[in-house]
């Protein structure tokens, strides 16, 4: 126990020091319906003539990818595609994408897709200009070389990867999802275009929306007070509670869809200033072991971690209760904090997201708990998890 707490304290001190030395991150955002066209025109204005479009096969089959880059296609520039990116992308997919990029002689990457596509494209952008194994970049600030310019067009309202300087990649051999972060991985520009997200099925809308909520909550209750993370988190949290149930009930609600696209972006800006937390430390293991979609994993884990964190995070959770308009009759700060946690549970229920996952196997509990604890020590969490804490949550989440 002491070694885990000591390591956490050491890492938090080191990361705060590094944050003070880190260069400022420059990021341009185009927002609103049709903003993908603006981004493409911006790319063309930079003089790029050979472009790699990273996407996935489903988006290409649906015509979403081509719709997003219509301005590029109409301009007649040389476009190559890499669409072998799957949920929970792997280092093998990064390597395959790098080879496609090099063979095409592409000068820039335009990523069209959800968080998996954008994260994979981030590491591809670094791998294309380095002979080093990307597995050596796990952690913070290890991508020190110049990367291929990356532009992002998200097609889901969830990960906020278009606004972050980090990527999550699966190491298949180790059953591990690892985080690689550094300022050079932040997309040069992004287009938050809700028009590209209109056809999302309700289940994906729900899971990705809860992913955005998780990002915002973890940024809000973390112990590292930096920049405008609270302001961005507040915008995201209030918007998700208001807009997500509306889109889930009526996929044609364009105003709610546009609001959720911006909520995910604000949540991404929030975690980019601090980091994620215990929810992600556990949810990443579900993705690595079982391929559970990241948003769904976060949604299921979130209430358990909030209950676990309630003591030290009580004041912050009570503030969030006020933000979303729950717990007005609560007589204590603790009761108000509980009202917010209950509101998160109720939101999950309204979105038909359960409290357990069929995929989890009891024989994996010990390994998952150990991996989650080791990951969480690098996050500014309000309460540090021990293996027994994770095991208790896993037991409740296992069918």
Specify the residue positions occupied by each region the protein language model found.
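An N-terminal, well-structured beta->alpha segment
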Residues: 1-81
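Short, amphipathic C-terminal "tail helix"
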Residues: 363-399
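N-terminal small/polar loop signature for handling phosphorylated ligands or for N-terminal nucleophile
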Residues: 52, 60-132, 246-257
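Glycine-rich phosphate/pyrophosphate-binding beta-alpha loops
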Residues: 158, 265-298, 375-380
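Glycine/threonine-rich beta-strand-loop-alpha-helix active-site module
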Residues: 92-195
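Carboxylate- and glycine-rich phosphate/diphosphate-binding segment that chelates Mg2+/Mn2+
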Residues: 166-274, 388
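Gly/Pro-rich interdomain helix-loop hinge
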Residues: 289-364
């Amino acid at each position: 126990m002491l070694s885990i707490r000591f390591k956490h304290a050491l890492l938090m001190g080191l990361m705060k020091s590094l944050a003070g030395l880190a260069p400022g991150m420059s990021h341009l955002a185009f927002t609103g319906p049709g903003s993908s066209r603006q981004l493409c025109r911006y790319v063309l204005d930079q003089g790029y003539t050979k472009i790699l479009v990273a996407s996935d096969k489903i988006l290409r089959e649906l015509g979403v990818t081509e719709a997003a880059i219509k301005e590029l296609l109409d301009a007649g520039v040389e476009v190559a595609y890499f669409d072998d990116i799957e949920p929970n992308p792997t280092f093998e997919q990064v390597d395959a994408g790098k080879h496609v990029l090099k063979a095409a002689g592409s000068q820039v990457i335009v990523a069209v897709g959800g968080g998996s596509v954008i994260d994979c494209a981030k590491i591809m952008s670094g791998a294309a200009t380095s002979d080093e194994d990307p597995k050596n970049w796990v952690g913070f600030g290890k991508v020190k070389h110049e990367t291929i310019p990356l532009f992002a067009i998200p097609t889901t309202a969830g990960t906020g990867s278009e606004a972050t300087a980090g990527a999550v990649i699966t190491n298949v051999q180790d059953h591990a999802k690892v985080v690689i972060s550094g300022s050079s991985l932040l997309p040069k520009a992004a287009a938050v275009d809700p028009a590209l997200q209109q056809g999302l099925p309700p289940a994906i809308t729900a899971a990705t929306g809860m992913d955005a909520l998780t990002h915002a909550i973890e940024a809000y209750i973390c112990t590292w007070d930096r920049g405008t993370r609270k302001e961005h988190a507040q915008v995201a949290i209030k918007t998700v509670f208001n807009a997500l149930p509306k889109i889930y009930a009526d996929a044609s609600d364009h105003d709610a869809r546009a609001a959720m696209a911006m909520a995910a972006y604000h949540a991404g800006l929030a975690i980019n200033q601090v980091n994620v937390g215990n929810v992600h430390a556990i949810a990443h293991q579900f993705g690595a072991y079982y391929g559970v979609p990241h948003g769904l994993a976060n949604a299921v884990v979130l209430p358990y971690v909030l209950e676990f964190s309630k003591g030290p995070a009580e004041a912050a959770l009570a503030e969030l209760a006020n933000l979303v308009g729950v717990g007005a009759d609560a007589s204590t700060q603790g009761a108000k904090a509980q009202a917010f946690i209950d509101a998160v549970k109720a939101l999950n229920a309204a979105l038909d997201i359960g409290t357990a996952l069929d995929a989890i196997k009891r024989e994996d509990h010990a390994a998952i708990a150990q991996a989650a604890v080791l990951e969480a020590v690098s996050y500014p969490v309000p309460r540090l998890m021990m293996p027994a804490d994770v095991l208790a949550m896993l037991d409740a989440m296992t069918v």
